[in-house]
């Protein structure tokens, strides 16, 4: 994901033999990778969302949900255990910390985005039984807690999510039950509700 630090990118990866805590950052300007401090809790199928350096909580990367077990190469791998854990990376301090509160819904393969005011929105994903979720949660760093918002119209996992120019949140495609979808939805942040958008 873009961290807006010299147009760098960060990623978390599996070493092919199991879970790893390694976090690498790619410096676009130099064309080089380098390591930063590792994630506190190794897991796969997590989502990342970053805040802009100039924002209220600038220079943070959220590592959201994920799974502790199963086959990270398979969307429906057996033995997977979803988690509600959320960790936050401080870019300036090169340090990972827990948010202090887990999400109310453990999930993997979810969508996660941050808005200009530094707040985190998490939606969808799947639980430990590979059931797709509609649930949406909101994290406000000022109080350090999650709160539930209106659920998506349809549950989905492993989908694209982004913030539109007007601040609304859009989700695109993903997996619904046992099939993939091209459907899209938009969350009206001010109105607090979802609506269907044209399919991709």
Question: What spans do the regions from the language model cover?
Answer:
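Kelch-like beta-propeller repeat domains
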Residues: 1-200
